[in-house]
Amino acid sequence: MTHGQMQKGMMGSEDMKKSMMTGMDAMNKIAMSGDTDKDFAMMMKVHHQQAVDMSEMELAHGKSPAMKTMAKQIIAAQKKEIAKFDRWLAKQK
């Protein structure tokens, strides 16, 4: 592995860790409503967005074709679920 490849891999890993921490911060800042269903949807939406963000980092920095394929599948599935949460939350206002 060249130094450049190692740096690229580290950048991807560090970006992923920062994304996880940002997502955790976002989840911690969500004010709980006391409505379990609404709180579940809000928290899961952030959680799913983290999965999308991490998958995009895998596509940008990863090397494994298998992991890149999985990342693409995760992005598609999680975006659909985020849209479902958005639709449900929109009806709760």
Task: List the model feature ranges, each with a label.
Residues M1-K93:
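His/Met- and acidic-residue-enriched segments that coordinate or traffic transition-metal cofactors
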